[in-house]
UniProtKB/Swiss-Prot annotation:
More info: Carbon 2 of the heme B porphyrin ring is defined according to the Fischer nomenclature.
Enzyme Commission numbers on file: 2.5.1.141
Purpose of the protein: Converts heme B (protoheme IX) to heme O by substitution of the vinyl group on carbon 2 of heme B porphyrin ring with a hydroxyethyl farnesyl side group.
Keywords linked to the UniProt accession: Cell inner membrane, Cell membrane, Heme biosynthesis, Membrane, Transferase, Transmembrane, Transmembrane helix
Protein name as catalogued: Protoheme IX farnesyltransferase 1
Membrane-crossing residue ranges in chain numbering: 28-48, 54-74, 100-120, 122-142, 149-169, 176-196, 222-242, 243-263, 280-300
Length: 300
């Protein structure tokens, strides 16, 4: 009698799906979806409509996963030379370049159709523009062309709150752009801190990250300046009446913490501080947007 098929009897199938899932950068996409959700919620004074909520999150997630897979594909050579990324699916041969391209194309196409049909064309095209901005303009060109790669390319990564806003309103709004500004200013210190820690690897693969081209001390100064600019930007939702006291308190505490970590990085010679700044920046963004969400429903 033939044995029934199961995933456990075919571990290679399970490993293959894990490789494709890994290429979508699920942790990065999860944080991005939080900012999308906050954009949606802040756009609506009442409960979110189900269809644009579900379709918007699903479609944006799929297109973000597609962009991440294209990033894996384009960076496969340098990924194989860096300790942080050498174990990714393409450098290890777990997924071929052809299959990675087909996977990214299929995932992105499905996401676009979902957004276009079940959300609105505006959100579909804006998300597509973000995909092109991240996967092609940033990854394929800017990353290798200029030490300001993160600053210029960061605009594509700052779009999610706007995508969430348009998904439920089908229109632009100045408040959504404030959220974009916050993420835009958050991105450089976040990535530059990682680049300081990995500067030798970036130099090895000829990626002109700021610590490689301008030195560590200059980069530390830039991180500190950007955290101060970010702190100012984080106050804008309060100043325009978009958010209330709860967000103001949380934002002030988080900004103070971020500036303190950046100050430590600049003026204390301590091993591991760059990665502390990098990790703190992730918590900063996550908690900041959670505070925006909670404040919206408590003070709306």
């Amino acid at each position: 009698m033939a044995k029934p098929l199961s995933i456990s009897s075919h571990p290679s199938i399970h490993l293959a799906w894990r490789a494709y899932f890994e290429m979508t950068k699920p942790k990065v996409v999860a944080l991005m979806l939080l900012t999308v959700l906050v954009g949606m919620c802040l756009a609506m004074p009442t409960i979110l409509p189900v269809k644009p909520l579900v379709a918007g999150l699903l479609g944006i997630a799929m297109m973000a996963g597609s962009a991440a897979a294209l990033n894996h594909l384009i960076d496969r050579r340098i990924d194989g030379m860096m300790a942080r990324t050498y174990n990714r699916p393409l450098p290890k041969g777990r997924v071929s370049a052809t299959r990675a391209l087909l996977f990214a194309a299929l995932l992105g196409s499905l996401g676009f159709v979902i957004l276009y049909v079940f959300t609105n064309p505006l959100t579909a095209w804006l998300t597509f523009a973000s995909l092109i901005g991240y996967a092609l303009i940033y990854t394929a060109y800017l990353k290798r062309a200029t030490p300001q790669n993160i600053v210029i390319g960061g605009l594509a990564g700052a779009m999610p709150p706007l995508l969430g806003w348009t998904a439920v309103t089908n229109q632009f709004h100045g408040h959504a752009l404030l959220l974009v500004i916050i993420i835009f200013l958050w991105t450089p210190p976040h990535f530059w801190a990682l680049a300081i820690h990995r500067r030798a690897e970036y130099a090895k693969v000829d990626i002109p990250m700021l610590p490689v081209t301008h030195g560590v001390e200059f980069t530390k100064t830039c991180i500190l300046l950007y955290t101060i600019l970010l702190a100012i930007a984080c106050l804008l939702p309060v100043l325009v009446g978009m958010s209330g006291p709860l967000y103001f308190v949380c934002s002030s505490l988080l900004s103070t913490g971020f500036i303190y970590k950046a100050w430590q990085l600049k003026y204390q010679d301590c091993e591991g501080l760059a990665m502390q700044v990098f990790r703190f920046s992730i918590y900063h963004l996550m908690l900041l947007f959670m505070a925006l969400l909670l404040d919206h429903y408590l003070w709306a």
